[in-house]
Amino acid sequence: MDVPHGADDEQAARWNAPVGHAWAEMQPVLDGMFQPLEGLLLDAVTTTHGGHVLDVGCGTGGTTLALARRLGPQGHCVGIDISEPLITVARARAEQEGTPASFIQADAESHVFEPAAFDAVISRFGVMFFHDSARALANLRSAVRDEARLRFVVWRSAEENPFMTTAERAAAPLLPDLPARRQGGPGQFAFADPDTVHHLLAGSGWAQIHIRPVDADCTLPTSELVRYFTRLGPLGQVLPDADEQSRARVVKTVRAAFDPFVQGPEVRFTAACWLVDARAGAHTPT
């Protein structure tokens, strides 16, 4: 495992503490929610090419394993994530289903990959959390062969994704200590500006860059909604320390705020994303 330093420590601490365990616990719900995006990533790597594929920010391995199943014996998939709780789940899933994928617990920004080891890189919401995105994208470029394909999905703006901010907006008046999103830093909407993404990729050794909007219709069971917003996101960080009365008031208020998204047994929302494609340029940046 890489040992992160400086600002990288913050992400390592975050994803190896209760946040990481919460995401591991919610794995079935999250995999179901984001299943509509899975095909977009898998289509980037066809069975006719096979080869070695890297899944960045792989979490509990859902996309990595799906791709490994599609490629079969002619390919090999490697997932990398900074979170030990998530990688532990991913490895257990691979072993349980007998899928030949492997997983690395490390920070993809600083991990020393074998040069030109991969034929493609994919990521589902895994590239927005780097401390230094340019450094991370250059490191990924060094890990792939020339002309290798990069495809990732990232969130567009918070304004275009009201479902994702409903909980914190509803809870903010009741929780003065609720962590605010940091503008310009690592986080869910760090790649919301397509011009910034294009600039980062072009400066990190990637070419043939294409960025297009994708709106995915996502769902989760209504029965999982309260667990979803109390375990994940800003509320998941502060509610464990709240007294019972405050917690009940927050849960009631936030649950009501989600009513526009609830349709009987399902919660439905649109994930407004960017689908980003690029090819590794002929020369690794120095």
Predicted segments — roles?
Residues E109-A120:
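A short acidic, Gly/Pro-enriched loop at the edge of an enzyme's catalytic core
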Residues H52-H111, R135:
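Class I SAM-dependent methyltransferase SAM/SAH-binding core
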Residues L71, A94, A171, L201, ...:
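Conserved hydrophobic residues forming the short capping helix/wall of the S-adenosyl-L-methionine
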Residues D2-P4, R14, V19, M26, ...:
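Conserved Class I S-adenosyl-L-methionine
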Residues V45-T47, L71, V144:
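A generic alpha-to-beta junction signature in SAM-dependent methyltransferases
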Residues A134-R135, R141, R145, R149-L220:
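Conserved catalytic/acceptor-binding region of the Class I
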Residues G32-G51, A66:
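Conserved alpha-helix/loop element of class I SAM-dependent methyltransferases that forms part
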